[in-house]
Amino acid sequence: GKTYIDGGAINNVPLGSLVERGYKDIIMIRIFGVGREKKVKISEDTNIYTVAPKVSLGSIIEFDSRKTRTHLKLGYYDTLRMIYGLKGKIYYIDESEEECYYLNQLVKLNAENYQHIMTAYKLPQAESRYCRNMTEIVLPVMAEELKLSKDWTYKELYLAVLEATAKLCRISKYKVYTVDELREKIQEKLHGLSGR
């Protein structure tokens, strides 16, 4: 008999043939299955757009229709993320604000929330220390707890906090949200929980 090896085992991203044929704009769909990824030399005038899941898709030989529908939905939203430059690691967030907006959102707390945070982090609650406590202690610790990179931005921190809270509130991730829409969804959910 003859031995046959699926091309995915030898080269699971067959990009080379498209580059060799002279295509300049290539959309690469990644599923991160078994196999190798062959190195391809890409010229500077070739644009590679990558759609890749941020979660594991599981085994390639699982044939579950419900999981397949979920993967199709995930692929659709990951494609929207790539095309429209959506932010977020879990959610699909359309944002366009400047860095100072996110800093303001992170430090603008009412007195009760500020007091709660200062108590949780065992910091002095003097009003004169407000800015320094938040920017030099609380926000860097939050970034570390959320496992952000060492050179995190206020935008990254705010979106990470927003996403972590949305996940805890079990808000559906399969929708494109603006920052305000996701924050409002969270507030609605939290208001509903506190009303019980």
Question: What is each model feature region?
Answer:
Residues G1-R196:
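Patatin-like phospholipase
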